[in-house]
Amino acid sequence: MYCLLIRKERNMERKKGEKLPRDFYLRDALTVARDLLGKILVHQTPQGILKGKIVEVEAYMGKQDAAAHSCKVRSPRTEVQYGVGGFAYIYLIYGMYYCMNIVSNREEIPEVVLLRALEPLEGLEQMQQRRNVRRQQDLCNGPGKLCSAMDIQKAHYGIDLCGHEIYLEEGEPVTEEEIGVSKQINIDYAGEAKDYEWRFFLKDNP
């Protein structure tokens, strides 16, 4: 099992709303996962801008993580994970919902962070139309829901998150006291990995 080393990323020079640089993603997924809390996911769509604050994530640590898609055979599906960090790994679950992961670390180290929930910030009307849901709390409170609300699809597999269509911005600072930690969800098949506490979330976010 990995030992979690908290490595604080130096972001004092980044202002709120500034796009995250490539270096942010070139760290292990556990570090990136914690630092993603409070950051803003942005999608520039033809219908307008969609924004949501990241409030829940899970880290998947590659070859030594039985819950990771990249644990076993390298395949076309997981190929993007073997590149440098800062690209999107999108996959379909249950034949109907997409999930968005952020590739982390350096080349040939296939680690990702799954986005599990957002707090909607901008483009609420478009999100409500896409989800056919009115309550703001229900728009992005799950990995499939957030992809639907944010209009993230299979076509976005491999998109560069340092580009201009889908990217992440600096948000309000998050302290260690605000972060909750738990086991990941729905990975009972993953042997000892099911007990790894690699899910991180903002404690006071509904």
Model-derived regions: residue spans:
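Basic polycationic patches enriched in arginine
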Residues: 7-10
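Conserved, well-structured core segments that form or line functional sites
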Residues: 12-206
